[in-house]
């Protein structure tokens, strides 16, 4: 009998309309993406960059730890020895089509040379556009050095 009354009075429909009306006037959780940006964690892992020392010299010492630890094998490094006996990279490439943005390269680097920035809005129109070379990585690092240093400092107490 109760089932017949529920069916006759359309109980489920009334319940559903109640939920709809309750949520209709509630605060919206939608973020209108291009105009509004969501806050990012200081540990967000986006586009890669290479850093320099304050005197302008690149930080990478060609230890190849990042290349060894990369699970996707997205990093390729060729190094050469300088006249003063130090080693530096001749070629440093990251293939972003292979990269899984795990952050292992950043963790393995003893000199903080390779970092993942906050940049997530990038694209490639041609096949080679997502193949990052050493000059491109250094240019990104130079452009965003202040932000990279600020994020590193904010994350330092937790490392």
From Swiss-Prot:
Organism: Neisseria gonorrhoeae (strain ATCC 700825 / FA 1090)
Membrane topology, as annotated: Peripheral membrane protein
Essential cofactor(s): [4Fe-4S] cluster
Upper taxonomic lineage: Bacteria, Pseudomonadati, Pseudomonadota, Betaproteobacteria, Neisseriales
GO molecular function, one term: NADH:ubiquinone reductase (non-electrogenic) activity
Known function: NDH-1 shuttles electrons from NADH, via FMN and iron-sulfur (Fe-S) centers, to quinones in the respiratory chain. The immediate electron acceptor for the enzyme in this species is believed to be ubiquinone. Couples the redox reaction to proton translocation (for every two electrons transferred, four hydrogen ions are translocated across the cytoplasmic membrane), and thus conserves the redox energy in a proton gradient.
Cofactor note: Binds 2 [4Fe-4S] clusters per subunit.
Binding positions for [4Fe-4S] cluster 1 per the UniProt entry: 60, 63, 66, 109
Catalytic activity: a quinone + NADH + 5 H(+)(in) = a quinol + NAD(+) + 4 H(+)(out)
Listed name of the protein: NADH-quinone oxidoreductase subunit I
Gene3D superfamilies recorded: 3.30.70.3270
Domain 4Fe-4S ferredoxin-type: 50-80, 90-119
Keywords attached to this entry: 4Fe-4S, Cell inner membrane, Cell membrane, Iron, Iron-sulfur, Membrane, Metal-binding, NAD, Quinone, Repeat, Translocase, Ubiquinone
